[in-house]
Amino acid sequence: MRTPITTHSLLLLLLLQQLLQPVQLQEVDTDFDSPDDEMEELEEYLEEFQSTGPTRPPTKENVERRVIIEPGMPLYDRDYCNEEIKRKNVYHKYRCVTEHYFLLMQYDELQKICYNRFVPCKNGVRKCNRSKGLVEGVYCNLTEAFEIPRCKYKSFYRRGYVLITCAWQNEIHKLIPHTINDLVEPPKHRSFLNEDGVFVIPP
């Protein structure tokens, strides 16, 4: 009578092993996935890429990834924009962006500009915030609009005052950079400050 019980026990153990095996494999696979931040970045990119609604509000991570650059590739390199825009996935849905700025500075320094005084800026935007000091960066201007990622840009090295717009982020209760409006090189013989101490862009 003991033999059937032993046989059934072995069969049950084998069945349990088969049932548990996929769960174990799934757990092992998860350990080899990309880091959480990379997966989140991919999900954000795909959501923005496929979205038909308005552009999502900026986040610190988004600005850091798309705007802030580290020392490395020479800023004077004529292919700088072509390489960096492709590497950082700087696109607007299915289209190439018409212009973009890369800034050689820390994000915290950029965020502090949001609390500087308002100044006029380009493209009809009334209020921008200006950096107090000069910043190095690269201005990218679209020259040939192919299907992404084959966008072609002309790169311009600049060292000037950063003009940005900012937006309030409820999650962190802070102003954060929204768009880089311009990187204005100072004129050689004229000041950007008028008699009242207001920053103005000369014609």
From Swiss-Prot:
GO cellular component terms given for this protein: extracellular region
Entry keyword set: Disulfide bond, Glycoprotein, Secreted, Signal
SMART domains: RNAse_Pc
Molecular functions (GO terms): nucleic acid binding
Disulfide cysteine pairs (residue numbers): 96-151, 114-166, 121-128
Entry annotated with the keyword Disulfide bond: yes
Biological process terms in GO annotation: defense response to Gram-positive bacterium
Keyword Signal belongs to the record: yes
List of glycosylated residues: 129, 141
Annotated signal peptide: 1-25
Similarity remark: Belongs to the pancreatic ribonuclease family.
Function: Does not exhibit any ribonuclease activity.
Protein name: Inactive ribonuclease-like protein 9
Gene that this sequence comes from: RNASE9
